[in-house]
Amino acid sequence: MGAELPTRPVDIKRIGLDAVDEVTELFLGYLEFYKRPSGPEAARAFLMERLKRDESIILAARMEGEPALLGFAQVYRSFSSVSMAPVWILNDLFVSPHARRLGVGRALVRMVVDLARSAGAARVILSTDESNTSAQTLYESEGFTTGHPVRHYVRRTDG
């Protein structure tokens, strides 16, 4: 598998409340990918609430000079007591199926890492479905690793 090479530069912007409608369609695609379909009103409300409460950063990508959004990333900020520093969680990354392998996902990941570094974050963490091997390949090619001395556990509380 070769590296993604954008045909044109990817333009990435932070999304504010005024642009949530633009990213909602991509967010719906993301939810569908993870088999968690939602209606547009609920998806939009979720994104609006995260931004109103300053709980997340949403980045949106398009090819330079093109109006259509092709991908987005949503980051949540947390902290590491041991590192005594912020930690960024790259929680959501989605690229429209027709725009995959054009460098959009890679550009979004790199932007998240650059912004986290600028904000003094100790690290960026993320997770992906075990079956999503193309995402795993991207993350590993960008320096993300899975072998850590810390084991992560998950316990669902929603049922």
Positions of predicted regions on the chain:
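Conserved active-site alpha-helix within GNAT-family acetyltransferase domains
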Residues: R106, E130-P149, R155
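Conserved GNAT acetyl-CoA-binding A-motif
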Residues: A116-T128
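A short beta-loop-alpha structural element at the N-terminal edge
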Residues: V10-E25
